[in-house]
Each structure stands twice: as structure tokens, then as C-alpha cells.
Amino acid sequence: MLRIALPNKGRLSEDTRGLFNDAGLEVRSSGERALTASLGGEFEAIFVRAQDIPEFVADGAADAGVTGWDLVSESGRELTSHLDLGFGRCRLVVAAREDAGVRSLEDLARQAPPMRVATVFPNITRRFFEMAGVPVTVVPVSGAAEIAPHLGIADVVVDLTSTGSTLRVNGLREVETVLRSSAHLITAVAGPRNGDVSRKQEFDDLVTALASVIRARGQRYLMANVPREVLDAVRAVLPGLNGPTVIDIADHSRYVAVHAVVSADTIYRTISQLRALGGEGILVTRIERLIP
């Protein structure tokens, strides 16, 4: 049985549990404070801090894990991402005070060295500025890096942001994006896919289950009755995965039923186009899982 390390609290934990539940891998634990749980009876889950998951996976305490890519990068461990889970999206950015006159890394390089940079991500920050050729002194903090320039303990910050609103509220301006992050399913480089056949199959089944839910979230299943003579035009409107499925309707020679998978982003336009072609009885449903 594979052991999967999952975040033990916060939004990342909630979104992870939601994804696993939707994939049929219900998290079954003995209580809210339980350290382990069963995942649909197929896998064992252990609950740890998101920032510790890269270490647990790299050291073999867990076969796989779910955590933010920012934390994986900060750990410096050799880990492989098998799936971007599509939530927990954010950016790690360099930000300076609005009144500092800093608009680019070139502006930072012209400042009297060394610049002081406050961050929760000292390893990523050092690597970034070394590659940029900008000398800095990294000031590690455990949180609230955005107030460091106002307290005089740093000139700029490297901090996470989703919308940039927290930075703006604190009078900071984004200068450069260091890293884009989201939640990933990770393993060690020599992970389950390099193990025995049964463990490889277990892990492949896990990836397939999670990916099927992620893929389905942006799609809808559309069904409609359309005049037979406009099928060519309907095929142009409903490309689907491999084109629409066309089904004869009993006792109705003029109309056929078409079924197709359609992007949720374009569903309203698709419905309008079908109606213009004489489509009727249009039904749209959500898709729980999609395996191409």
C-alpha cells in the first residue's frame, strides 16, 4: 500500500481532500486530529505540515505527497512532479516600496549593495539573485515579510501573492516574478514508478484518478436534438474529444441526438450556435471524471 503525505491544515488541505474525495479516494480517519487515514481503502495518508512534505517524500517516509511547488523548490530536494493539481495558485515575487523608485531588477542592481531582502523563502531568493547577478543580503523571516521594508529591516521583499492586493495595501510594488506555484503531486526521483510492477500500477492508478477529476472540472457534457440535414454544421460547433456522438432517435427520422464534451468556458456560445441551427432539447451536465 502506497503512503501519501497530505497537508494537515489550511486551504491547501481542504482543496486536497476535496480532490481526493471527488476521485473516489475518500479520506477516512479516526478523528480530526488523526495523523494517518485510509484513502478509499487503496492508499494510506499521513498528515503533516505542507512545508515538511518535500522532506518526507525525499527521505522515503512517504511514497508521494501533495504540496505547493514553492515549498518543493525551497527544499532543494530532488523531487519529481507528476501532476499539477490546479489549485493553490500563487506567485513568488520581488516587491519594493512604492516610494523606493525601484521598477526592475536593473534598478535594484544600481542600489548601494548589498540590498537586504526579507523572505520566508531564503533558498529560492539566494538562487534567484545569484542568477540575476544582483548582490543581496537575505533576511529570513517566518512570516509577514511585507512589513519588513517599513520597519527598516529590509529594502525589498520576496513574498507570495495571488492577486497582489496584500502587497498594495502595504505600499509595495511588484518588481519581478521569481516563481509561479500551485499544488503538485510529487515523488522522489526514484519513486513508485521505478519500483516493482504492483507499486508502479498503484501509483499510475492514483495519477489517472486525480487527473480524470482535474480534466473534467473545465468541461461539460452536452446533449441536444438537431435536424439531420445540419449535421455537418453541428460537427463544426461541437468538435468534442473525437467529434460529437450522433445517435438516431426512435420514431423520429428528421432529428438525431448529438452528445459531446464541451469546454465550460464556451458553453453559452455553443448553446446559442446550436439553437441557431435548429437544435432543441439541449441538456448540459457536469462531468465527474474524464479519461480521454
Curated annotation (Swiss-Prot):
InterPro entries, per the entry: ATP-PRT_HisG_long (IPR020621), ATP_PRibTrfase_cat (IPR013820), ATP_PRibTrfase_CS (IPR018198), ATP_PRibTrfase_HisG (IPR001348), HisG_C (IPR013115), N-reg_PII-like_a/b (IPR011322), N-reg_PII/ATP_PRibTrfase_C (IPR015867)
PROSITE patterns: ATP_P_PHORIBOSYLTR (PS01316)
SUPFAM superfamilies membership: GlnB-like, Periplasmic binding protein-like II
Pfam families membership: HisG, HisG_C
Family annotation (CDD domains): PBP2_HisGL4
Subcellular location: Cytoplasm
Protein name in UniProt: ATP phosphoribosyltransferase
Source species: Gemmatimonas aurantiaca (strain DSM 14586 / JCM 11422 / NBRC 100505 / T-27)
